[in-house]
Regions:
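Cytosolic nucleotide-utilizing catalytic cores of signal-transduction proteins
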Residues: 1-134
Length: 134
């Protein structure tokens, strides 16, 4: 089918353009889908166009709470918002993950599960991870 070939070619180009960003942001993912590719390209654009999306992380950065940012990155990007999976990836107890999420809510003065803040935070965390690993 010609459409399958076009889709394959399009997805191959997406992977080629976003491979480094993709595996930096989603380094624990075993399965990658086209939305992951598109999101990685968006984050790459945000990073290289100096769009200040990571400023929402400033309350955690200014207080040296990098373990909370790493926990949020693992929880949101790697574990798909699953506390148990995040705890397994980080080799900590699930209550540690819950404590750090609660601490993030306090530091950010927002509920990280509320929409649209959750989407903004997800993007900021991804760009932060990309920025700190390139």
């Amino acid at each position: 089918n010609i459409n399958d070939i076009k889709d394959f070619g399009h997805n191959y180009r997406l992977v080629s353009e976003s491979k480094k960003a993709l595996f930096t942001i989603f380094h624990q993912k075993n399965l990658i889908f086209p939305p992951h590719l598109r999101f990685s390209l968006q984050c790459k654009d945000l990073l290289y166009n100096y769009i200040p999306i990571t400023t929402i992380l400033d309350p955690m950065i200014s207080n040296d709470h990098y373990e909370i940012i790493e926990t949020l990155a693992t929880f949101m990007l790697d574990a798909d918002f699953e506390v148990k999976r995040a705890a397994e990836i980080m080799y900590v107890h699930r209550n540690t993950i819950l404590y750090r999420i609660k601490k993030a809510n306090i530091l950010l003065d927002q509920d990280i599960s509320s929409w649209p803040f959750c989407h903004e935070l997800y993007s900021a965390i991804a760009v932060w991870r990309l920025k700190n690993n390139i």
